[in-house]
Amino acid sequence: MITPFFRSPDRAFTLLRGDCVELLKQFEFKFDMIFADPPYFLSNGGISMQSGKVVCVDKGEWDKGGTPESIDAFNRTWLAACRDKLKKDGTIWVSGTYHNIFSVASRLTELGFKILNVVTWAKTNPPPNISCRYFTHSAEYIVWARKSAKVPHYYNYELMKRINDGKQMGDVWRLPAIAPWEKSCGKHPCQKPLAVLSRIILASTRPGAWVLDPFAGSSTTGIAANLLGRRFLGIDKEEEYLYLSQNRRQEIENIKTFAKYRGKIKDIAFAEQTDVAHPGEDESWGYELPF
């Protein structure tokens, strides 16, 4: 019997504590979309610059690298578990840097996914390269793939075109890194900005959709999903980050805060009412988690 770590009153935001591979084996459910921000394996004692200070880039024990073989095996295992939980027409997004993204892309292909795009998130405010011996690391990569090569996926082409001044949306997104107001409940070392997750969710899901994040962290995926009228299941091992996620979700239960955060995300302004739903407005809201 699975007991949620936290569930919001409207049941649109649920958190589980544990290993995603083990937990996903324990229930039958199919998600419309998965976003995953797995370990990048870049914690190697390096340094970077933050707010004018030299800081270590290490994120934690969970982010320390192994051998190429062990990294491939790790990615193969969790991606296979996630594939089993995708609907036939579902898609998955996986973010990374050069440290892990090539392994991820190879494992996706190996497992039968069809890669649709590799989005480059070009950060408009990256930290400087203090060694001055190579180019500044100013981008992350997000692989978008569908479960099956033969089953069509959902893509909100018209909305993405509206967001991009009437032109087809490209695969290079110039968006800033996380803003200070997004850290109001605390800080996660790998927290993604709501602007990135909002675009991903609007592009690849319909209102009322179920979104899974197997490495939830501070649950930016879940906050973006709920701001956009989608539902969310997040899994993480770390109690500290689950409490941070819970606090972030409770923060937007305040109507004024909910509206303020929606107002700060540019892409939401382009979304018509048909792109955003609320609990009870769509019959798909009757499709619930089995715990």
Residue map of PLM features:
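Core catalytic lobe of class I
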Residues: 1-244, 287-291
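PRPP-dependent phosphoribosyltransferase catalytic core
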Residues: 244-291
